[in-house]
A protein has these predicted regions:
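Short, conserved active-site loops that position catalytic residues or coordinate cofactors/metal ions
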Residues: 19-20, 52-58
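Short hinge/gating elements
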Residues: 23-26, 367-368
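Membrane-embedded transmembrane helical bundles of large multi-pass transporters/channels
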Residues: 1-22, 85, 108-363, 480, ...
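Generic start-of-chain signal for non-secretory N-termini
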Residues: 1-3, 25, 33, 47
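Structured non-transmembrane domains adjacent to transmembrane bundles in polytopic membrane proteins
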Residues: 32-53, 61-139, 360-558, 588, ...
């Protein structure tokens, strides 16, 4: 019955997504920001002008790209006739005549124009193409023409890698396929639900990829934990139904708590007050919840059907699942217990070395200059950046729109315009400052400032800060006028600054929530405190590796990123929530085993050794699976997805090795019985009992036809 219900849910979810017609958008909104205020003022003063633009770039290596011919005139008219194009500029030509472009003003964000719009652009520019000139689309059109990620290929690679690891971990096809099948069903349902949600609210284009990546990784891991415990109970002599029931009560309970922790961290992104980021967290949360539900219902149902045939179709002799018998991990845990200070120092040294580059972290926006070579967006970017002359250079790919509110001004508009134009032109980092023109009603001045550097350059960010906080207020303050920088580049820099201010808030919310959850779960103060501190170490080390690979460019070419780029502004916030949540997964599984031993009467050191020995192999297998899944998504052409994939993979590796296998056991041995201290009400004595089912709990059998056992 459970399996049938899941198949019905699968069919309904897929059908619902097809009927919903989801649409994704990377539009960000920062109500109250200076760029948003300036954009709204521009729209009111310019009869609905949006500030959304695009470039149609023409190139002729031998010159004559901007020559006035019948082909250029026909193309200009065809571009002006396109839907949602409000105006087309005169052809701007470089000094050598090899490159020229039209700037198109749009009524809507180009991203919303639909996948068929590039074909319309091709038809509109057919005349200049036939004249032998190269045509590329850039500016705001890069959102429309940028190549989509090949998520299906990444998912297949991730599934294949997971299957190999599961076969090595379990030794049999049956045991390996069950967690994988459960994860696959969960991912399809989760993605379908995300699609249904996207039909009614704006979700980022990265949302489906993020949901698939997280859902596949945690789905396989959760299924692995339940299957491992099921096999352990079979070895102990339980019949299959009882083994399935006990697996749910122990590992299943931990799966639900781990999923709750991950979801808490992801939903905590809403605390930033940024809808764009909060909804990315929502998409990932949906996939985590579905994966956890499948692990505690669908996987046990499959285990109940397979029963003792779990080791059929063996590819090697199956490894016996034990409750901590003497093996290599038991000997390793004993070694850690003998020299905890040495292991702690070594682990901290590794974390410190990986975290050192964190001090150089620079947030920014990744522009079309990082798109794949040969793509139309990258070609347009490079042609404009490499050409010389007014309107060309790197900054022409991301100019600022200057908007001045003259309401209440005590000086004439032309005097204010002249003074501000001179100040803008004299500001270091400005490549060109266009004339400021008054609106029809004389209440607004507008103009364009072109930075000397590209949109993702640190110099452009510095110029933005100088203009917003010094040049504009210092120049306009005496005239009682107010200036703003609007346009996509200004909006992205405002977005970056907002995230920088709110990231500490998100970190605080997640830390407090996770500490509270673990405190209630383990009835301890030091255990949750240690957990949140060590998980912060994992996140910091992951950030450091991101800086080295992407910002410094060390090894970025292996991932298809051939230029150093800033860290996309929202990636650290997303990574913190995800890495912290996944780190808590392994923390909960390890501490659950340690707490069971402590609850059973073992001493602290003995409990730590027992828990480590019981969970080390399965945590290692789970980490390898998660790492393989994440790295498979590094093949995406989207740099942001590459960043998330690499950052999450590194975070999992660090957490499952240095943190979980070295720092956690060594600190717990050093802290001794203080690990388990928890304030009690007067008159109560004895050990604080973690809220975890132990191995001795009498759990009713699980049957595939009757769902979860009653607790």
């Amino acid at each position: 019955m459970v399996i049938v219900l899941w198949l019905v849910a699968l069919g309904c979810a897929v059908a619902g997504q097809h009927l919903a017609h989801p649409a994704y958008s990377d539009a960000t909104s920062l109500p109250g920001s200076q760029s948003d205020t300036g954009g709204a003022l521009l729209a009111r003063a310019s009869s609905g002008a949006t500030g959304y633009t695009g470039l149609v770039v023409v190139h002729a290596p031998t010159g004559g790209a901007g020559a006035a011919t019948g082909a250029t005139a026909d193309t200009a008219r065809a571009l002006a006739a396109l839907p949602d194009v409000s105006s087309v500029s005169e052809l701007v030509t470089s000094t050598d005549g090899a490159t020229a472009y039209w700037r198109l003003d749009f009524d809507v964000r180009p991203k919303t124009l639909g996948s068929g719009y590039p074909a319309r652009l091709d038809r509109a520019t057919a005349a200049v193409r036939q004249a032998g000139r190269q045509v590329a689309y850039g500016g705001g059109l890069d959102e429309l023409t940028r190549p989509a990620g090949n998520d299906r290929a990444a998912e297949l690679v991730g599934l294949s890698a997971a299957l190999v690891v599961l076969l090595l971990a379990f030794g049999s096809v049956a045991a390996a396929v069950l967690p994988l099948a459960s994860a696959l069903v969960a991912v399809v349902i989760g993605l379908s639900v995300v699609g249904i949600v996207a039909a009614s609210v704006d979700l980022a284009t990265a949302a489906p990829t993020l949901a698939a990546m997280i859902g596949l990784g945690v789905g396989v891991d959760y299924g692995l934990f339940v299957t491992t415990r099921f096999r352990a109970h079979l070895v102990e002599g339980d019949d299959p139904d009882r083994a399935a029931g006990r697996a749910i009560a122990s590992s299943g309970h931990a799966v639900l708590l781990a999923a709750a922790t991950v979801s808490l961290a992801l939903l905590g992104l809403y605390g930033a007050g940024l809808t764009f980021i909060g909804r990315l967290g929502l998409a990932a949360t949906i996939s985590v919840v579905v994966a956890a539900a499948a692990a505690v219902t669908l996987v046990p149902a499959g285990l109940g059907l397979v029963g003792r045939r779990i080791d059929r179709l063996a590819v090697r002799p199956p490894v016996a699942e034990t409750s901590g018998a003497e093996d290599g991990w038991q000997r390793y845990s004993a070694l850690v217990a003998r020299r905890p200070a040495l292991f702690l120092a070594g682990g901290l040294a590794v974390i410190a070395a990986l975290s050192l580059p964190l001090g150089a972290l620079r947030l920014g926006h990744i522009d079309a200059g990082a798109d794949p070579l040969g793509s139309t967006s990258r070609t347009a970017y490079d042609l404009v950046a490499d050409a010389r002359g007014p309107g060309f250079g790197p900054g022409a790919n991301g100019p600022f729109t200057v908007v001045v509110d003259l309401h209440g001004a005590n000086q004439p508009a032309d005097a204010i315009a002249a003074k501000l134009s001179a100040a803008l032109g004299a500001t270091p980092g400005v490549g060109a400052a266009g004339p400021l023109r008054a609106s029809a009603d004389g209440t607004v001045l507008t103009g364009t400032v072109t930075p000397a550097s590209g949109p993702q350059s640190a110099a452009t960010g510095t110029l933005f800060e100088q203009l917003v906080h010094h040049t504009l207020p210092d120049t306009l303050g005496g005239a009682h006028a107010t200036g703003y920088l609007a346009g996509p580049t200004a909006g992205q820099l405002d977005f970056r600054d907002t995230i920088s201010r709110r990231l500490p808030l998100i970190i605080g919310l997640v830390l407090v929530g996770s500490f509270t959850l673990l405190m209630l779960m383990f009835r301890s103060l030091l255990i949750p405190l240690k957990a949140v501190v060590l998980n912060l170490f994992t996140t910091g080390a992951s950030y450091g590796v991101l800086v080295v690979v992407f910002q410094w460019g060390w090894g970025g070419g292996l991932l298809g990123v051939h230029e150093a780029v800033p860290i996309e502004s929202y990636v650290p916030m997303m990574m913190f929530a995800i890495v912290f949540g996944l780190s808590m997964d392994y923390e909960i599984f390890l501490l659950s085993a340690i707490a069971e031993a402590w609850r059973g009467g073992s001493g602290n050191t003995e409990a730590v050794g027992s828990g480590l020995a019981r969970t080390a192999r399965v945590i290692t297998s789970a980490a390898v699976i998660m790492t393989a899944v994440f790295l498979s998504f590094a093949s995406s052409p989207t740099v942001v997805i590459k960043m998330l994939a690499v950052g999450l993979a590194v975070g999992v590796v660090i957490d499952a090795t240095v943190v979980r296998m070295v720092l956690v056991p060594s600190t717990m041995v050093l802290l001794g019985s203080a690990n388990w201290w928890f304030p009690r009400r007067p008159g109560r004595a004895g050990r604080a009992r973690p809220v975890l089912p132990g191995p001795g709990v009498d759990v009713p059998p699980y049957t595939a036809g009757h769902g979860m056992p009653h607790q």
